[in-house]
């Protein structure tokens, strides 16, 4: 499966040029934003961890091993990319225990920058946002067009597609999900089951969003839409009055798309017809998600880009900094600017 099949059309026109992303881990930096004041006491030890070339699950295993704890005693808010320099929180459940010596977990690819006690464990999805610093190298672009495009996406946002990372190499996770759906079976292994169910829901969401982008309605409220605020998991039905809400224009309020699960579609009008059409075409995949007891959820169609800034440290390097809500993909922001080409290696340090 190619990129267009897995995501959909761009909203702001063809790419303004091309560049390389992730020539080194420092080219893709992620800082988790967590709005939780720590108490300084309690049976949970929270760790602020920097890791390079290491995914979240691998880091959790390292920390658990060094602490002499079962893996289930280590918690984190969200998964971060392996091919990146990331900083995120972990928590260790240590009832009645002293802080462990975690030196064995640390090395060139993992450093514990801060630790503090708290009275609660870190829950999945607890982070409010992620801050990104991206360096795009080997830049070949129309600079004037790129500047205009950057201004435009800062003002209008971009389609909130799930990124290619969600689907595996050449969409392999979607292919596997369809195979299981055809047999109406669920993978026995928990991690595989979670990955394939997530890929299936993400793919169907992207299909709906792709049609809204093609129709020019991805950033507009329609009667029958379900609307949600940035960062909120609650939503409400749009009537004529709601479609004129001024908070839509300032990117606080957005139309949403389906994360499929059990129950009827809660949308109405043309929105429900479009979403039902995607469900009908997917057939077995939707039935499979229902069989897996997935609950129907919603995700905003439009991705607002917080605090977008940029500069050119070298003529052929574009450096971006911005903040996205949790669960959103920096690569879909870049996709509205540039085509990405395979990475070589670069020694240029990332300094914003």
Curated annotation (Swiss-Prot):
Catalytic activity: uridine(13) in tRNA = pseudouridine(13) in tRNA
Record InterPro entries: PsdUridine_synth_cat_dom_sf, PsdUridine_synth_TruD, PsdUridine_synth_TruD_CS, PsdUridine_synth_TruD_insert, TruD_catalytic, TruD_insert_sf, TruD_pseudoU_synthase
Active-site residues, as the UniProt record annotates them: 81 (nucleophile)
A cellular component annotation (GO) from this entry: cytosol
Domain TRUD: 157-303
Enzyme class at the top of the EC tree: isomerase
Role played: Responsible for synthesis of pseudouridine from uracil-13 in transfer RNAs.
Family in the record: Belongs to the pseudouridine synthase TruD family.
The protein's name: tRNA pseudouridine synthase D
Classification of source organism: Bacteria, Pseudomonadati, Pseudomonadota, Gammaproteobacteria, Pseudomonadales
